Amino acid sequence: ALKDTRAMLDPSEFMRALHLLSKTEHVDFYAMDNNLDIANMAASSFIMANKCSTVHAAMTMQYLQATGAPKEHVAFFISRTGENRMLLDIARLLKLRGNSILLITASPESTLASLADSVFRVATVKRMEELGPRVFLLGAKYVTDILFALLMTRVDYRNTQQKEEWLSQHFHY
């Protein structure tokens, strides 16, 4: 499945996304169900790359986030089908407000994909018994890990080292 995702990915999409992410200080994630797990992992990685990130599990909060998001925020959607009605409502609102939209999906011809500025297509399988959602999550995590690695190339190593030192001095577990 990961080989399939790797073959589907277009390097120019990563460059387009990197350009959008480099211009912003804040990434708002929009996802539902198991995709929220990927959004949370990506958000914690992006924070390490100096990108403030927001993830809300409740759809009400995602709607509110979209209504108040400054246009400088980049919206990052994770949707296997690209046809979730609630995510579509949010994406349409963000598009009207002028926000850039990134999308990870298994459906590059979906309605949500048509609203996105950058689309990452990942593998899935059609039948639930073939673990379709799990295959999708694996590919989605792969994409967010690559984006994190790209963002980290833009971070000053000394800054990262200072953060690490501060954390080790002030947080003892």
List the predicted regions and their residue ranges.
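A short, well-structured juxtamembrane/interface segment
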Residues: 6-23
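Residue-level recognition of alpha-helical structural elements
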Residues: 10-13, 95, 159-160
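Helix-enriched interaction subdomains in cytosolic or periplasmic regions
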Residues: 1-3
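A short, charged, Gly/Pro-tolerant segment at domain boundaries
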Residues: 157-173
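Glycine-rich phosphate-binding loops that contact phosphosugars or nucleotide phosphates
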Residues: 22-142, 146-156
